[in-house]
């Protein structure tokens, strides 16, 4: 039992559960937005739905991260930056990781299935195998295409769509959640390009595909800037197509909290790119992007609650 908890602790530290902050806030924002979107608005979100969404996100992210770690263990062992991870360092065995991956897949399907009897919504169960397939795709994509950054972005971009499907399936018939998913896809794809700058030589040596390995540092930074500009455009469209997010709520102004969030996100992305130019990857990747996710979710949820 002690060994089991020790291995679980090692894996939790290795996949950095705190980095769930990149996707979970957008799932929660979508969950609050979804009841008011579509042709048949729902009365609101139930606490049980929120709990199931959080559990689904936990299982999905853990499944995705461990699948990536398992399939990449030989590449990680050859990279000084990642050689200390649990699998290449030998602190856990592949069979331990496979066991947890299977548990997470079962956990995700079970939580998705619970929406059926509890909320008469069987769409999450039907979608769960497709979600698992997409989440596993990133781990192998980098072997074949430099667009793997956007496959990762798409995996995180599933979070608002899946949450909307779970709370109010009719919400996916309207643009806001699709635009939000597009923002997440481009935002994550852009900052993953920046993060991959650290591994240019390793990726080229191992035959792994990435935009930095293909284009080099300068063109990759320009690509990331362009991608993030497109992401900001989609974020503005999210606001314009969602009444809750465009209605003024800040006293004495014509701004919603979400519109203020968009302005602040633009500033944070500018800081992120300046940090990347100075090779300050920890600041650019973790701190600033965590702030972006929390800021947008908090601002959006505040606007939704103020509309009630």
What is each residue range found by the language model?
Residues 21, 50-57, 73-128, 205-258:
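Multi-pass membrane catalytic core of lipid/isoprenoid biosynthesis enzymes
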Residues 26-71, 81, 105-113, 122-137, ...:
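Membrane-embedded alpha-helical segments that form the functional core of polytopic membrane enzymes
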Residues 4, 9, 230, 236-308:
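Extended hydrophobic alpha-helices typical of membrane-associated regions
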Residues 4-8, 25, 51, 130-133, ...:
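Alpha-helical membrane-protein architecture signal
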Residues 16-35, 153, 157, 293-298:
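The first (N-terminal) embedded transmembrane alpha-helix
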Residues 8-14, 62, 84-175, 179, ...:
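Intramembrane alpha-helical segments
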Residues 33, 114-118, 140-141, 165-166, ...:
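Helix-loop junctions at the membrane-solvent interface of multi-pass transporters
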């Amino acid at each position: 039992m002690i060994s089991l908890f020790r291995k679980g602790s090692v894996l939790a530290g290795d996949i950095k559960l705190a980095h769930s902050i990149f996707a979970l806030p957008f799932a929660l924002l979508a969950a609050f937005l979804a009841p008011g979107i579509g042709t048949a608005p729902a009365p609101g979100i139930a606490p049980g739905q929120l709990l199931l969404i959080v559990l689904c996100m936990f299982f999905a992210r853990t499944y995705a991260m461990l699948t990536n770690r398992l399939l990449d263990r030989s590449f990680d062992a050859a990279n000084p930056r990642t050689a200390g991870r649990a699998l290449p360092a030998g602190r856990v065995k592949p069979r331990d990781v496979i066991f947890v991956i299977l548990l997470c897949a079962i956990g995700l399907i079970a939580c998705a299935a619970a929406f059926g009897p509890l909320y008469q919504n069987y769409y999450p169960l039907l979608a769960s195998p497709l979600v698992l397939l997409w989440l596993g795709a990133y781990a192998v994509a980098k072997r074949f295409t430099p667009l793997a950054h956007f496959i990762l972005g798409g995996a995180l971009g599933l979070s608002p769509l899946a949450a909307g499907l779970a709370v109010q399936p009719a919400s996916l018939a309207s643009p806001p959640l699709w635009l939000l998913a597009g923002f997440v896809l481009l935002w994550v794809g852009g900052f993953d390009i920046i993060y991959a700058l650290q591994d240019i030589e390793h990726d080229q040596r191992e035959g792994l595909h990435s935009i930095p390995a293909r284009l080099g540092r300068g063109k990759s930074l320009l690509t990331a800037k362009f991608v993030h500009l497109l992401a900001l455009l989609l974020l503005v469209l999210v606001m314009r197509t969602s009444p809750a997010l465009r209605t003024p709520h800040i006293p004495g102004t014509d701004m919603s909290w979400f519109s203020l969030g968009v302005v602040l996100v633009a500033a944070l992305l500018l800081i992120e790119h300046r940090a990347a130019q100075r090779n300050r990857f920890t600041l650019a990747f973790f701190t600033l992007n965590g702030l972006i996710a929390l800021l947008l979710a908090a601002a959006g949820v505040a606007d939704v609650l103020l509309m009630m």
